[in-house]
Amino acid sequence: MMIYPTMELLDGRCVTLDKGNLDAPMIWHVDPVETAKGFAEAGAEWMHLTDFNALQGDSSNQDLVEELIRTAGLPIQLGGGIRSREQAEFWIEKGVGRVVIGTMAAYDPAAVAELAKYYPDQVVLAVDVWQGQVMTEGWRKSGAWTPEAFVKAFGNAPFAGILVTDIDSDMSDLDAQLGLISGLAEQAHSPVIASGVVRSKDDISRLKYLPNISGALVGRALFNKTITLEEAMETAQPNPEPVAEFL
């Protein structure tokens, strides 16, 4: 299972949010570019980047995001406010490894499925769930989709992954989160990436045994030093098969 060290940007700073609440971010006083380089130096294969300003239609982080793409030293999976084919192609042309699309997918599934076919392995479907409904517009609007129907609507579209976030689940209720994620993974035709479920090595150990889960985002736990990136990646590796000792 792949670990995606995760950076979330608001007003040029690294932050984490509580249940998607943009009004009370936890601000981490670190340099975004140096932090991203640190992810690469630790051996990460990808990083995930969410631009919370772009979610609100504000492009003020654009220069910083472009700098991260150029200098981080590892491919970036970018989410936040990518709501048209033009925006998706803009970032792909800038060199981003993958674009994460949620709101556009809820409103125009056919266009997003077509985009995934045109850019195979570069489009990730975001499934952000609040009280059993898929949320759009930066988690501010409840759409008409259940998570199950949303995933099913895309059939065999060649997404690079399906990023599942259970926004309202209490972080202490890991069983509920894993239930949602594993249920969607059973139905999905693309590998599922779990978001918002990793607080410790134990959480990674549980997650890696769920079928069709290809990766997990790890953000807050890295910034508050609950777990190191090296520990997270080591834990995510499959356990070695026992080898019989021959005397």
UniProtKB/Swiss-Prot annotation:
It is found in: Cytoplasm. It catalyses: 1-(5-phospho-beta-D-ribosyl)-5-[(5-phospho-beta-D-ribosylamino)methylideneamino]imidazole-4-carboxamide = 5-[(5-phospho-1-deoxy-D-ribulos-1-ylimino)methylamino]-1-(5-phospho-beta-D-ribosyl)imidazole-4-carboxamide. GO terms for cellular component: cytoplasm. Gene3D superfamilies: Aldolase class I. CDD domains: HisA (cd04732). It comes from the Bacteria. SUPFAM superfamilies: Ribulose-phoshate binding barrel. Its EC number is 5.3.1.16. Its main location: cytoplasm. The active site is at 8 (proton acceptor), 128 (proton donor). Disulfide bonds: none annotated. One of its GO terms (biological process) is L-tryptophan biosynthetic process. Pathway: Amino-acid biosynthesis; L-histidine biosynthesis; L-histidine from 5-phospho-alpha-D-ribose 1-diphosphate: step 4/9. Belongs to the HisA/HisF family. PANTHER family: 1-(5-PHOSPHORIBOSYL)-5-[(5-PHOSPHORIBOSYLAMINO)METHYLIDENEAMINO] IMIDAZOLE-4-CARBOXAMIDE ISOMERASE (PTHR43090:SF2). This is 1-(5-phosphoribosyl)-5-[(5-phosphoribosylamino)methylideneamino] imidazole-4-carboxamide isomerase 1. The lineage of its organism: Bacteria, Pseudomonadati, Pseudomonadota, Alphaproteobacteria, Rhodobacterales. The gene is hisA1.
